[in-house]
Amino acid sequence: MASVFSTDLITFSLTATDKVDAISQMAQLVVAAGRGSDAEQITKDVLARDEMGTPQVDGVAIPHARTSGVSQSSVAVARSTNKNVIFDEDEGAAEVLFMILV
């Protein structure tokens, strides 16, 4: 079984200004790493799952979804340069994101 982690799935320069943009940029990272074929589908599925809530605490958010957009389970990691990506209004902005895709 291949690892769900890869250095190709890590970025320290996420420029997103909101959660939709953050998820989209991370989905594009997954596709660029060869772990998926459809960034749009990944984004759609993660946003649909986000409607039920995304875990977030102390500046770390964990958007996740089951999606047909990936060819193998993957975890993408990103650090936001804007530090203003909000998944949970009560928790404030997230600076670090772990996007789990299966």
Where are the predicted features?
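Cytosolic covalent-transfer regions centered on His/Cys nucleophiles
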Residues: 1-102
